[in-house]
Regions:
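Glycine-rich beta-strand-centered segment in the early N-terminal region that forms part
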Residues: 2-16, 29-70, 98-101
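Short beta-strand-to-turn element immediately C-terminal to the catalytic PLP-Schiff-base lysine
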Residues: 26, 49-52, 88-89, 176
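A secondary-structure boundary/capping signal
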Residues: 12-14, 26, 90, 135
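NAD(P)H dinucleotide-binding glycine-rich loop of Rossmann-like/cofactor-binding domains
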Residues: 57, 67-134
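Histidine-centered active-site/metal-ligand motif
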Residues: 20, 42, 117
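Mid-domain Rossmann-like dinucleotide-binding core that forms the NAD(H)/NADP(H) cofactor-binding site
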Residues: 104-176
Length: 176
């Protein structure tokens, strides 16, 4: 079990997603420079099990999710991530997980945030748009659902049958 600094908490991982970038990292070909040993895991939720003395906004038992990019560091890439039984994190990196959100869905906050950013901040998607979504993994499916909620027409390109079905269930207009 790792030791914590005064401004850190110890988190017990409760749910950790495996992103394609984690696979690239483990294969030694991720785009951000990194050095082994390194623990992957940037899509996660967990429980605070120990609190450093200068931490004021979190307490034992708090359910949390965390930031992926922290300044120059990338959680699970340039610094070790959440794919461990326990890991440390700075209070400023964490957000409380609402009681209505279970740990499994909490681990989806990061990929859903990527989809939200793409739709709302980069794409400014609205009902006049037609989107082509390349891939129906977690981020592609979140983009599909979000685009439909915004009224856009969606075309999802996905070779895997069960992911095609998931895209249809989330409202994709066309799936190829």
């Amino acid at each position: 079990v790792p030791e914590i600094s005064d401004d850190e908490v110890l988190v017990a991982a409760r749910s950790v997603g495996v992103c394609h970038s984690d696979i690239e990292l483990l294969e030694g070909r991720y785009i951000i420079p990194f050095q082994y040993p390194l623990i992957p895991g940037h899509e996660w939720s967990g429980e605070v099990v120990k609190v450093g003395p200068s931490v004021k906004g979190l307490k034992l038992g708090d359910r949390v999710v965390g930031e992926c990019v922290i300044g120059d560091d990338h959680f699970g890439f340039s610094i070790s991530g959440a794919a461990a039984e326990f890991f440390t994190a700075k209070e400023s990196w964490l957000h409380k997980l609402p009681d209505a959100v279970d740990y499994t869905n909490g681990a989806l906050v990061e990929p859903f945030s990527v989809a939200y950013y793409a739709l709302m901040r980069v794409g400014n998607v609205n009902a006049s748009d037609v989107l082509v979504v390349l891939g129906a993994g977690p981020i592609g499916l979140a983009v599909t659902a979000g685009a439909k909620a915004l009224g856009a027409v969606t075309l999802v390109v996905e070779p895997v049958a069960h992911r095609q079905e998931a895209a249809k269930k989330l409202g994709a207009d066309y799936v190829v």
